[in-house]
Design a protein with these regions (language model features):
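Ligand-binding loop in jelly-roll beta-barrel domains
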Residues: 78, 98-126
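Conserved hydrophobic/aromatic beta-strand scaffold that supports enzyme active sites
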Residues: 48-52, 69, 93-95, 117
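Extracytoplasmic low-complexity repetitive segments enriched in small/polar residues
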Residues: 36, 93, 115, 119, ...
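Short acidic-glycine-tyrosine-enriched beta hairpin
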Residues: 53, 82-101
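Glycine- and acidic-residue-biased ligand/ion/polar-headgroup-sensing regions
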Residues: 65-83, 92
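A short beta-loop-beta micro-motif enriched in histidine and acidic residues
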Residues: 43-44, 55-69
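Extracellular/periplasmic catalytic domains that process cell-envelope and extracellular macromolecules
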Residues: 40-41, 63, 71, 107-112
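A short, N-terminal "cap"/entry segment at the start of jelly-roll beta-barrel domains
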Residues: 1-45, 131-147
């Protein structure tokens, strides 16, 4: 059982009651995996971003040049790939593949999605490379929370 909840009216991650009255802080693991895709060079570029995606909007097509992890703080996001869609809601933590063309879409009509991203890329590469829109049509399955 998780120690957080998602408010259905705002689709926002709510942390409540995590820190006991006699304690100073609590750590909660949201994602813990062995990662083989991290750069092995002596240096890596690390970037932490807060991103927002407005209701009904779609990000541009792009690829990641290194590993990226996202924590979705508010709203819903659908990732569109050539062969599949992936759907996430507030409270989810996920990673996106390296070098695979995709885009993020916020299918909610009213709530902006808010995410924190943690990026690790080889020092000589940009985190993201924008790409020309592909000629194929992405799989666009509806987000389960809207359907």
């Amino acid at each position: 059982m998780s120690d957080y909840s998602v408010d259905p009216d705002t689709l926002a991650l709510r942390l409540s009651g995590l820190v006991p009255e006699d304690g100073s802080h609590v750590r909660q693991v949201l994602y813990d995996e062995i990662e083989t895709r991290l750069p092995r060079d002596p240096e890596a570029r690390i970037n932490i971003q807060l991103s927002e995606l407005n209701p009904g909007r779609t990000a541009s097509w792009h690829v990641h040049n290194g590993i990226v992890y996202f924590a979705l703080l508010r709203g819903i996001v659908s990732l569109q790939y050539k062969d599949r869609s992936e759907h996430y809601s507030a409270g989810d933590v996920y990673t996106e593949p390296i070098g695979v063309v995709h885009r993020a879409h916020n299918p909610h009509p009213e709530i902006a999605a808010a995410l924190i991203g943690f990026w690790v890329t080889a020092a000589d590469r940009p985190h993201i490379t924008e790409v020309v829109a592909p000629t194929w049509v992405p799989i666009d399955q509806p987000h389960p929370s809207l359907g």
